Amino acid sequence: MIRHFYIVFIMILLSCKKDSQTTEKAQQVDSLSNGTSKPIESPKQFEFTVTTEQDFIKAKAKFKDKLTQDTINFPKINGEIKLPIQGDKPTQLSFRDTLLNTDDENIREYKYEGQFKDIDHYVVSGTFWEHYEIYLINKKTGENTLLWNNPTLSPSNQFIANLSLPFGLEGTPIGIQIWRINKTKNTSNFSISKHLEINPIDWAPTDFVWKSDKIILLKVAKVDAFLNNNGIPHKNDYYYLKLSF
């Protein structure tokens, strides 16, 4: 009887220890990433690990941005940008500025940033009273995908990523968005769908670079570093994370 009680006691003790280790590990991972994903269709797996400034700089030097800044080809005329859409019935997509040089809250100004020729999408930015956003526009269909900030195409054209706006703007999200490039079978048509959105709790990203199609390196700082230094963290406040997904 005593032996039986002893065996049961040991099993319970080991079980508690295992649960404690699992909880501790989960807390460590949460402390590192402090992120939650908001996928569109189903949960996506992602992982944050610490990397170095040297790795970040090396990846920056190697990476080539694929945005073609052919802004001279689509000039703004009388406050309006017109972009040709190559559908079954060719048409134009128009972006018109309003109320420039005023203090009206309805002010808006658009800028043609360029295009990703590899996936047939224009990039247009919109600046508003207290807001900024990016439009990723399909050149063949005119379909518009709304992004937080300026996008960057991955090395093999599988994904697009963009950060949030700089920390400190009231009401704006903090984090990173990742978009999947979908190619229609037996055609040259591309579409964009959200793959992953990560909203960290206590840190904010300031820069990023693609290391591969499934790995992004981020330069980040704790939210407190922004709050305690008028929105500009000290150099030593920054650290680097590797996002694998």
Kindly label every feature range from the protein language model:
Residues 105-112, 147-156, 199-208:
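Repeated scaffold domains used in trafficking and secretory/extracellular systems
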Residues 24-126:
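Terminal domain-start segments
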